[in-house]
Amino acid sequence: MEFVSLASGSKGNCYYLASNEGAFLVDCGISMKRIEQGVAALGKGGMDAIRGILLTHEHRDHIAGLGPVLRRHHIPVYGTRDTLDALEEKVIGKVDRHLFYALDDEVLTLADFHISYSRVSHDAADPVSYQITWQDKKIGMLTDSGVLSDENMNALYDSDILLIEANHDVDMLRDGPYTYYLKQRIGGRFGHLSNSNCAQALPEIMSARTKHVVLAHLSEQNNLPMCAYQTVCDALAAHLPKGHAVDVHVASQKTPLALSLPSLT
């Protein structure tokens, strides 16, 4: 199974998961050209193998490429009812809304992936994070949340691959050029997790099976990859049991990051 961050950051987000049975995207916030090129490079059947697009929420950096992708490839889109209703024609253009499917409380199955979700704290209509199981493996994903609830922590716990937001360094945000209002929004309850928020949570949601931690949705203005990486690594070194080896990765806005999980057979 392949897990690929095609792009992650404040300018656009898109993740790709694929097995021999099929594939899907989480968010569609970059250009169709980048998505098509990134998917084709992985050799898993290209866009024809994609069974669905899961949306976390309706902000532009998560849906900017959705309209062109739907008009060319006619892929089903899944999200909460309020998220789908909030997709504006001025952003995505005219699309066939018969391709939209509202999530319910049942586990969604795409190819041989099983997908559940938990709601997050962000200034959007009804934002969610996704938890994916494939065979005996689990991938936990959460970005765009100002806080982590107990529900979020439980949903992410015991993941083989754990993708979590490390959006900003608190000092860089405080001392940076953003307006007071924007600083309060980003650092507030309905904003984004900081490096320190992420570092504090990780030891509680990791388990012995966690092999990869992916730091995601970094701000270009208010963070540095090495700052996020070092903050998290210091926390893990202080709190994880000796002998628990985990690879920490920083997802990039421009360069894909690919991880693999082995099959049972």
Predicted segments with their positions:
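Conserved beta-strand hairpin/beta-sheet module of binuclear metal-dependent hydrolase folds
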Residues: 1-42, 46, 126-144, 161
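Structured catalytic core of nucleotide-sugar glycosyltransferases
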Residues: 4-14, 56-66, 117
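Active-site environment of divalent metal-dependent phosphoester hydrolases
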Residues: 11, 59-63, 84-86, 124-125, ...
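Active-site neighborhood of phospho(di)ester-bond hydrolases with catalytic His/Asp-centered motifs
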Residues: 26-29, 50-58, 78-81, 140-143, ...
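Active-site metal-binding motif and surrounding structural segment of the metallo-beta-lactamase
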Residues: 32-79
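Metal-dependent catalytic neighborhoods of phosphoester/phosphodiester hydrolases
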Residues: 64-73, 88-91, 223-230
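Metallo-beta-lactamase
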Residues: 81-129, 133-136
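Cap/insert and terminal regions of metallo-dependent hydrolase folds
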Residues: 150-250
